[in-house]
């Protein structure tokens, strides 16, 4: 909505009606109340005077994207994450599909990291996960400047919609079935391994895990790496400062030396914000970085 180069023509949601959609857009427990105007008119969602067609199809193959001129579809259900499943959107007239999650077979791209590898022949691509979008630029800057021999990643991750407010059945992930509001819950994540897909030279060099914590938004990536080229923490800070100002990574990587906490980043547009005062170094080749 804020990008003048993007024209949102339609949205599909089979689970809520139009009036409820207006309510959910207007009020948000994390980001607060929407400051603009949102309403309905003639069966459409109207945001700041812009009418948006609303579909309510469970099967993406039945969504008539072509009738509203939608060329690019963001597949963000978390269900249709393979090329075969996401390609169903193409049947309705869409030209390209971007999966907002990791995919087992779709080409994966992270802004600032490997967009140069994009081939227009691709009709379905993955934009990876939120964690990978934070970790991959972090790893790229370090690897390009100092080289990564190996590393371990931990993400301290905010609550997600799949978690439970009270203990409940979760046969495939017993710990994931525990109440979110009073637990730190160990979990798996494929984010570190996914970095190997967008930075092939790091394939097999990184792995990681997650802790789900009772916060609503903003997560942390804690990356511990052994460097190929000895350096100092000051040189690492300089590398990230320069990256945040470069034409390649400006707006994707940000840099801060302030004594910030997680809520200070609510609504931040950067994918990866390097916390210069958050990291530590054991020696000139072994370092923990925070973003």
Swiss-Prot record:
Q: Which PROSITE patterns match?
A: GAPDH
User: What subcellular compartments does it reside in?
Assistant: Cytoplasm
GO biological process per UniProt? glucose metabolic process; glycolytic process
Annotated site location: Activates thiol group during catalysis: 157
- One of its Pfam families is Gp_dh_C
Q: What class of enzyme is it?
A: oxidoreductase
Reaction equation(s) it catalyzes: D-glyceraldehyde 3-phosphate + phosphate + NAD(+) = (2R)-3-phospho-glyceroyl phosphate + NADH + H(+)
E.C. code = 1.2.1.12
InterPro entries xref list: GlycerAld/Erythrose_P_DH, GlycerAld_3-P_DH_AS, GlycerAld_3-P_DH_cat, GlycerAld_3-P_DH_NAD(P)-bd, Glyceraldehyde-3-P_DH_1, NAD(P)-bd_dom_sf
Query: What domain of life?
Result: Eukaryota
GO terms for cellular component = cytosol
Q: Active site annotated at which positions?
A: 130 (nucleophile)
Q: Which residues bind D-glyceraldehyde 3-phosphate?
A: 129-131, 160, 189-190, 212
Record's Gene3D superfamilies? Dihydrodipicolinate Reductase, domain 2 (3.30.360.10), NAD(P)-binding Rossmann-like Domain (3.40.50.720)
Q: Which GO terms describe its molecular function?
A: glyceraldehyde-3-phosphate dehydrogenase (NAD+) (phosphorylating) activity; NAD binding; NADP binding
Amino acids binding NAD(+): 13, 58
The record's similarity note reads:
Belongs to the glyceraldehyde-3-phosphate dehydrogenase family.
What's the protein called, per UniProt?
Glyceraldehyde-3-phosphate dehydrogenase
> Which species is the source of this protein?
Boletus edulis (King bolete)
């Amino acid at each position: 909505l804020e990008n003048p180069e993007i024209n949102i023509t339609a949205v599909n949601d089979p689970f809520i009606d139009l009036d409820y959609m207006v309510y959910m857009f207007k009020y948000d427990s994390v980001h607060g109340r929407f400051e603009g105007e949102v309403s309905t008119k003639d069966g459409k969602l109207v945001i700041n005077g812009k009418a948006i067609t609303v579909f309510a199809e469970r099967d993406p193959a039945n969504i008539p994207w072509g009738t509203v001129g939608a060329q690019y579809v963001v597949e963000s259900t978390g269900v249709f994450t393979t090329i075969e499943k996401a390609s169903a959107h193409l049947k309705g007239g869409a030209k390209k599909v971007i999966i907002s999650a990791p995919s087992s077979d779709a080409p994966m791209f992270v802004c600032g990291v490997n967009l140069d590898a994009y081939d227009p022949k691709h009709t379905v691509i993955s934009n990876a996960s939120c964690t990978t979008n934070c970790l991959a630029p972090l790893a790229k800057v370090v690897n390009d400047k100092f080289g990564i021999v190996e590393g371990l990643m931990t993400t301290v991750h905010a609550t997600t919609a799949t978690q439970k407010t009270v203990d409940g059945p979760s046969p495939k992930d017993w710990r994931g079935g525990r109440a979110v509001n009073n637990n730190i819950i160990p979990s798996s994540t494929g984010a570190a391994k996914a970095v190997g897909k967008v930075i092939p030279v790091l394939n097999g060099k990184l792995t990681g895990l997650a802790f789900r914590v009772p916060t609503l938004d903003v997560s942390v990536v804690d990356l511990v790496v052994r460097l190929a080229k000895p350096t100092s923490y000051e040189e690492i800070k300089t590398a990230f400062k320069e990256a945040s100002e470069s034409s390649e990574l400006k707006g994707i990587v940000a840099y801060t030396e302030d004594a910030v906490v997680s809520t200070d980043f609510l609504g931040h547009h950067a994918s990866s914000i390097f916390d210069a005062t958050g990291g530590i170094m054991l020696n000139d080749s072994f370092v923990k970085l925070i973003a």
